């Protein structure tokens, strides 16, 4: 068995899944949106971030998906960068009017933040990514808006109407797009930091972001690996990702770090990171499913194939 696989490469394993599992994948394409893309990150100091990975779409007709909450990875990474560069990581953020129900989309997933509650920035990052709380994303948005506008960072007295809220979102999203255009050469369709809008992005852009997170040893990777948040205001929140939760033994896998789930109609998505060694990872993107059960079944099939094929390979 070892001799059989010793010369096979990870890109060859990934590419081989396209024909091997096509009939199975095809049965899950109920929405017509199904996209399954695998990425291999194997870092070389002489390569740029955008060229430091291999990726292959093993099922699907398009290079674009509706990311839903996967888009939060882009937003939160930017917010964390701004907050850290302004030395606010140890401060307390007060929830303001940015989470008013009359402002936000009624379909947005929330954890029920209340005006006047206080959280640290990293607690809000955890809430944004682990239970995928849209209200936490909006609170981070308002703080970063204040920083960029040279307002007192915890202020929300200016937020008096839906028009003010919309201006905040438009401004923040323009800054996020500018940031990724400048730092990673990405042209993102990002018009709400939570991913609630149905804008299309390229799957390769997701790979570029994940490559950057790994290369920079981002705090985000430690956060999305958690099965639940730390205790926040006396409460913990479970991850939306079954593959990092030991209480979900059918799916839990010790090599999976996380990354993000996403959920809009016709776009139930799952992005996982399979760790091979400190500088070698495989990301699994399953997007466009009808339900989350299908994203997990497809991902389980791919993980089992990786386990079987990678077991005898020396890296």
Indicate where each model-derived feature is located.
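Penicillin-recognizing serine hydrolase domain
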Residues: 3-57, 63, 112-116, 121-124, ...
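Active-site SXXK
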Residues: 65-93, 206
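Boundary segments of small protein-protein interaction reader/adaptor domains
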Residues: 103-105
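Short, well-structured active-site flanking segments
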Residues: 81-100, 187, 217-226
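Short helix- or helix-capping micro-motifs
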Residues: 125-132
């Amino acid at each position: 068995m070892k001799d059989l696989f010793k010369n096979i490469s990870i890109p060859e394993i990934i590419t081989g899944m396209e024909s091997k599992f096509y009939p199975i994948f095809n049965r899950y394409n109920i929405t017509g949106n199904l996209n399954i893309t695998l990425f291999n990150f194997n870092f070389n100091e002489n390569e740029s971030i955008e060229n430091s990975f291999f990726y292959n779409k093993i099922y699907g007709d398009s290079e674009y998906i509706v990311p839903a909450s996967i888009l939060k990875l882009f937003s939160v990474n930017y917010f964390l960068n701004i907050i850290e560069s302004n030395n606010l990581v140890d401060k307390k953020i007060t929830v303001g009017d940015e989470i008013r129900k009359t402002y936000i989309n009624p379909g947005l997933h929330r954890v029920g933040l209340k005006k006047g509650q206080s959280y640290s920035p990293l607690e809000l990052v955890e809430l944004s990514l682990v239970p995928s709380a849209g209200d936490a994303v909006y609170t981070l948005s308002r703080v970063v808006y204040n920083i960029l506008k040279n307002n007192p960072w915890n202020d929300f007295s200016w937020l008096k109407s839906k028009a003010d809220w919309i201006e905040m979102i438009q401004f923040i999203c323009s800054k996020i797009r500018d940031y990724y255009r400048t730092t990673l050469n990405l042209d993102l369709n990002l018009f709400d930091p939570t991913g609630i809008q149905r804008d299309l992005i390229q799957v390769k852009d997701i790979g570029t972001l994940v490559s950057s997170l790994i290369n920079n040893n981002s705090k985000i990777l430690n956060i999305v690996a958690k099965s639940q948040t730390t205790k926040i205001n006396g409460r913990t929140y479970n991850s939306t990702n079954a593959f990092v939760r030991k209480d979900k033994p059918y799916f839990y896998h010790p090599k999976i770090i996380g990354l993000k789930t996403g959920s809009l109609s016709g776009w139930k998505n799952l992005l996982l990171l399979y760790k091979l060694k400190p500088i070698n990872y495989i990301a699994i993107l399953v997007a466009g499913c009808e339900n989350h059960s299908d994203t997990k079944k497809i991902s389980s099939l791919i993980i089992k194939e990786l386990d079987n094929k990678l077991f005898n390979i020396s890296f």
